[in-house]
């Protein structure tokens, strides 16, 4: 064999070897199956590092936590949530609270949490003390809701404050899976979103953009303290608002509720008075009125 041929053979083998190595490394990062690796563990807490913090207002922020590898995904079914745990001074045992990420498994390498810090909120206040590079203990997935495309014809949602997070997760999944996007989800969605002041309306720009993009999604805002010229709802969410804005009781509809406990209690009574099936103390997937 000539020196030229030998050199070409060596180069070819080097290229093939490099390609095989790249495939093996890629397979390792993707969990060996060609699919992104899911990192959530439903039985054990894991530490995730705070990567970014974006302050939306004086008491609301989006926390971005890094996953171990840039190709990893959280592995959170649509409609489910995660548990956050922390040891907090003055508390006799570890505090655990549930949150729904506003990101999805379509976004690899991280997950985002939208959190409002309440004066009496243990985990929400703890999050405000975290610095970039600090760890947060996370476990999941958990929850009775697992959304599947076309599980019902029409969904009516009532959200208050940060109760918008599980709703947004489902709304975005539905719109991503529309026929125009290569999917098959034709579910209609109507959302009543209640807040105290205009500045309390979280993720309003994103919601408005989704309304523009999708004619199967509508939002009705309700404010306790509306500004001059406000055209949305005023005060608390009423049975009349529900009757006018959300789907009427039927076998193929679902009402979803998420918000402060007093609001949820009132909405359970309101929906029952309008003929929807009475909400259970602990919701199940098949329930007509589902409380997160």
From Swiss-Prot:
Residues engaged in binding FAD: 128-143, 154-191
EC assignment: 1.6.2.2
Q: Which reaction does it catalyse?
A: 2 Fe(III)-[cytochrome b5] + NADH = 2 Fe(II)-[cytochrome b5] + NAD(+) + H(+); 2 Fe(3+)-[Dph3] + NADH = 2 Fe(2+)-[Dph3] + NAD(+) + H(+)
Please indicate which superkingdom the organism of origin belongs to: Eukaryota
Q: Where in the cell is it found?
A: Mitochondrion outer membrane
Set out the biological process GO terms recorded for this chain's protein.
protein histidyl modification to diphthamide; tRNA wobble base 5-methoxycarbonylmethyl-2-thiouridinylation
All copies of the FAD-binding FR-type domain together span 43-148
To which pathway does this protein belong?
Answer: Protein modification; peptidyl-diphthamide biosynthesis
| InterPro entries referenced in this protein's UniProt entry, alphabetically | CBR-like, Cbr1-like_FAD-bd_dom, FAD-bd_FR_type, Flavoprot_Pyr_Nucl_cyt_Rdtase, FNR_nucleotide-bd, OxRdtase_FAD/NAD-bd, Riboflavin_synthase-like_b-brl
Keywords linked to the UniProt accession:
FAD, Flavoprotein, Membrane, Mitochondrion, Mitochondrion outer membrane, NAD, Oxidoreductase, Transferase, Transmembrane, Transmembrane helix
Q: Where are the transmembrane segments?
A: 12-32
One example of the protein's molecular function in GO is: transferase activity
Summarize subunit and interaction data from the UniProt record for this chain: Monomer. Component of the 2-(3-amino-3-carboxypropyl)histidine synthase complex composed of dph1, dph2, dph3 and a NADH-dependent reductase, predominantly cbr1.
**Of which family is this protein a member?**
Belongs to the flavoprotein pyridine nucleotide cytochrome reductase family.
What is the role of this chain? NADH-dependent reductase for dph3 and cytochrome b5. Required for the first step of diphthamide biosynthesis, a post-translational modification of histidine which occurs in elongation factor 2. Dph1 and dph2 transfer a 3-amino-3-carboxypropyl (ACP) group from S-adenosyl-L-methionine (SAM) to a histidine residue, the reaction is assisted by a reduction system comprising dph3 and a NADH-dependent reductase, predominantly cbr1. By reducing dph3, also involved in the formation of the tRNA wobble base modification mcm5s 2U (5-methoxycarbonylmethyl-2-thiouridine), mediated by the elongator complex.
| Protein name, UniProt field | NADH-cytochrome b5 reductase 1
What organism is this sequence from?
Aspergillus oryzae (strain ATCC 42149 / RIB 40) (Yellow koji mold)
